[in-house]
């Protein structure tokens, strides 16, 4: 029984970490920020829909 407790204490002690938790900073989706601006033709309703629309 003593050996089981010793092994348990060592196993749980090995799981201890001093690393900080991950944290997010900044915008949620920062990809291509400032590189693409929609043109008036991009905002037209004729461009909306998938390849199956109107089939």
Curated annotation (Swiss-Prot):
Coiled-coil residue spans: none
NCBIfam families recorded: PRK13859.1
Subunit structure of this chain's protein: Homodimer and heterodimer of virB7 and virB9; disulfide-linked.
Lineage top rank: taxon: Bacteria
Keyword set includes Disulfide bond: yes
A single cellular component GO annotation: cell outer membrane
Lipidation (N-palmitoyl cysteine): 15
Signal sequence extent: 1-14
Protein's UniProt name: Outer membrane lipoprotein virB7
């Amino acid at each position: 029984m003593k050996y089981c407790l010793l092994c348990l204490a060592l196993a749980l002690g090995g799981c201890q970490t001093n690393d900080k938790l991950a944290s997010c900073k900044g915008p949620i989706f920062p990809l291509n920020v400032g590189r693409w601006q929609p043109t008036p033709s991009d905002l037209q309703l004729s461009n909306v829909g998938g390849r199956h629309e109107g089939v």
